[in-house]
Amino acid sequence: MKKILSWFFIIQALSLLTVGLYSVYLAQTPAQLEFSGYTPAKTVTAQGLGPNRITISDLGIDLPVQQAKIVNNVWPTSSSSAEYLTSSPLPGNTGNSIIYAHDWASLFGSLRNAKVGQKVVVTYPDKTKKTFVIAYTSIVPYNQASILAPSKDNRITLYTCTGFLDSQRFVAVAILKDNS
């Protein structure tokens, strides 16, 4: 009986270790923030014209923003900033602008607490600010790229990973309120 119990605990420990190591691997793999099946637009924002800061005061988010370009279906990520997808429109222009970051506490970890009506402020290098209001939030599978589709309004789609082993995306969509 002791031998069976010992083997049970050894197998359980190895299983937990495997899941833990796999979780660390997923957290450190840049491709985890990508949306499977997303095809970027042909137009790309000129370097330096994109936003350089995003603030969601109600969630304690105040981050620098770097420009990101998908290359060979790899979505660049940073451990210290959010990423603006340069193949999407500039935030505030007509269309669906995309900003994403890891779900770490220091990045978009609190985005999962976003509520309809909260303000998102995007700042540009010339100190121009665009204010958006969160219209809805949702959790979608990693392959539901339709959430990133072009739109006819002036929206910004913010997203981060969520779910078991980052298998889903938490999405907050905000609509342009004003130009300040």
Language-model segment annotations:
Residues 1-13:
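N-terminal Sec-pathway targeting helices
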Residues 13-180:
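Solvent-exposed, non-transmembrane regions of membrane-associated and secreted proteins
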